[in-house]
Amino acid sequence: MTKFVFVTGGVVSSLGKGIAAASLAAILESRGLKVTLLKLDPYINVDPGTMSPFQHGEVFVTEDGAETDLDLGHYERFVSAKMRKANNFTTGQIYESVIRKERRGEYLGKTVQVIPHITNEIQAFIERGAKASHDGKADVAIVEIGGTVGDIESLPFLEAARQMSLRLGRNQAAFVHLTLVPFIASAGELKTKPTQHSVQKLREIGVQPTALLCRADRPIPDDERAKISLFANMPQDAVISVWDVDTIYKIPQMLNEQGLDRIICEELRIDAPPADLSMWSRMVHTLENPQHEITIGMVGKYVDLTESYKSLIEALRHAGLHTSTRVNIEYIDSEELESGHTQVLESLDAILVPGGFGKRGTEGKIRAIQYAREKTVPYLGICLGMQLAVIEFARHVAGMQDANSTEFNLETEHPVVALITEWQDRDGRVEKRSADSDLGGTMRLGAQRVPVQTGTKASQIYGAEVNERHRHRYEVNNHYVPQLEKSGMIISARTPSENLPEMMELPGAMHPWFVGVQFHPEFTSTPRDGHPLFKAYVEAALAHRQRQAQRAVA
């Protein structure tokens, strides 16, 4: 029978509940347990697919095509289980499901209320999500409840968790509460009062934390932990200090050294061998002792909020791990390049244009791509980054000066990138779409297997086949592919049924390393295994840096 750990947050949001949950999961997995995770989001949106990155950060895409919270990316990077649609749900999905049942008459004429109908539905979703991994036989399911204690939006989720722990019985559920202990510079001390009030608020709704994770910018002294334990009505060893570190991959060791996994296993009556965190120790050692160093320029329009590119940033770090390289990322606002000032690109060892939507900043990205192509700087384009690479090549190499995407210019003479107008939905029905269709859930989503052309960089990186996740509405227009290929571009991977370009590259005679992919490889990169594409990209950046150094000496 699966046991549950509910992770809640207090005082403020963005304390790192997702990292804490993923780190605990990693420790429990290292003890030989099968672990899965769920994220419960209190917002009324059905999913984050149409939310602004400034509001929500990255949208993480699962293998089965769900647009989910970025915390699911942390989960997949920290544990071996693959997340699915059932591992993330929102208030919007809960209410949608309950209203559908009410319309079908499933409540037999009863008054539909938050308690019990909404809370029962939340519990049903939690139990369904816990069975999404490990063939439904997970030993532990860690359930992260979004928001903070005291938010009106989170109350039904907290109430559902309380009811569920009561229904499951003793030693079947535990609660971990993450809270803030701020340091007041003017007083020169840490203040525990916000944490005391947060735990008090949690206890008011019937939840007593099993363990308390206290976030601060420094380790919390024992006397402050003793004070917190007194007011929180819990043992002092269950008050765990979680201070700021330079890499999130130190967190599992930090929590293990303070006995969090022991406390949880004792509460849940789980008998498991000691944790083996040697892999995490090696990882941290490699991060702290790199043999090489490069700087990659990430050209985008959300560069002021790097959470928008969370999986991509981590994928580059993973590649650094597997090549003993410190990867520095310079975030470049694409709008600032539109005036033609490309001096900021001159010191870079490689250039990357990530995925995105909308016209704003695209001409600046195209200038960066042109610079990378003409100056033979290694280039990786992801999703929109590949589409813009095709547009840049069409304009400046293939002679189509007006080339563009219909996303940016419906009247373009050469629509080398165009809207996907027809595809199958998840039930196998063929759907027609237009620019006026709903935005939510109307993209090519999820993993897809694609054959790779032999003798290409793509085949050197991936072998015979690519299996990556997608999230896009627009595709390279097949009508223009012959003209692009005639000018030198190589389409190195195509979808088997529609024959749509999935990867493009330039031959070695034109550029040492210039690759674009329509999919999102960052979603499948992990610190354990890295990712072959990002590893090849970092190696290309190292080679470019070495060539530049040799030219400087000559």
Curated annotation (Swiss-Prot):
> Its catalytic activity?
UTP + L-glutamine + ATP + H2O = CTP + L-glutamate + ADP + phosphate + 2 H(+); L-glutamine + H2O = L-glutamate + NH4(+); UTP + NH4(+) + ATP = CTP + ADP + phosphate + 2 H(+)
This protein's GO CC annotations:
cytosol
Matches recorded under SUPFAM superfamilies: Class I glutamine amidotransferase-like, P-loop containing nucleoside triphosphate hydrolases
InterPro entries the UniProt entry points to? Class_I_gatase-like, CTP_synthase, CTP_synthase_N, GATASE, GATase1_CTP_Synthase, P-loop_NTPase
The Glutamine amidotransferase type-1 domain covers which part of the protein?
Answer: 295-547
**Entry keyword set:** ATP-binding, Glutamine amidotransferase, Ligase, Magnesium, Metal-binding, Nucleotide-binding, Pyrimidine biosynthesis
Q: Which GO terms describe its molecular function?
A: ATP binding; CTP synthase activity; glutaminase activity; identical protein binding; metal ion binding
| Residues engaged in binding ATP | 14-19, 71
Q: What positions does the entry give for L-glutamine binding?
A: 356, 384-387, 407, 473
What CDD domains has UniProt attached to this entry? CTPS_N (cd03113), GATase1_CTP_Synthase (cd01746)
The enzyme's E.C. designation: 6.3.4.2
* Activity regulation statement: Allosterically activated by GTP, when glutamine is the substrate; GTP has no effect on the reaction when ammonia is the substrate. The allosteric effector GTP functions by stabilizing the protein conformation that binds the tetrahedral intermediate(s) formed during glutamine hydrolysis. Inhibited by the product CTP, via allosteric rather than competitive inhibition.
Give the residue ranges for region: Amidoligase domain.
Answer: 1-270
For the protein in the UniProt heading, the enzyme class is ligase
Please give the pathway this protein is involved in.
Answer: Pyrimidine metabolism; CTP biosynthesis via de novo pathway; CTP from UDP: step 2/2
Positions binding Mg(2+) in this chain are 71, 144
Q: Which GO terms describe its biological process?
A: 'de novo' CTP biosynthetic process; pyrimidine nucleobase biosynthetic process
A Pfam family annotated for this chain is GATase
Family from the record: Belongs to the CTP synthase family.
Additional comment: CTPSs have evolved a hybrid strategy for distinguishing between UTP and CTP. The overlapping regions of the product feedback inhibitory and substrate sites recognize a common feature in both compounds, the triphosphate moiety. To differentiate isosteric substrate and product pyrimidine rings, an additional pocket far from the expected kinase/ligase catalytic site, specifically recognizes the cytosine and ribose portions of the product inhibitor.
NCBIfam families recorded: PRK05380.1 (NF003792), PyrG (TIGR00337)
Tell me, in a sentence or two, what this protein's role is.
Catalyzes the ATP-dependent amination of UTP to CTP with either L-glutamine or ammonia as the source of nitrogen. Regulates intracellular CTP levels through interactions with the four ribonucleotide triphosphates.
Quaternary structure and partners = Homotetramer.
Tell me the protein's name: CTP synthase
Q: Which organism is it from?
A: Ralstonia nicotianae (strain ATCC BAA-1114 / GMI1000) (Ralstonia solanacearum)
Q: Which gene encodes it?
A: pyrG
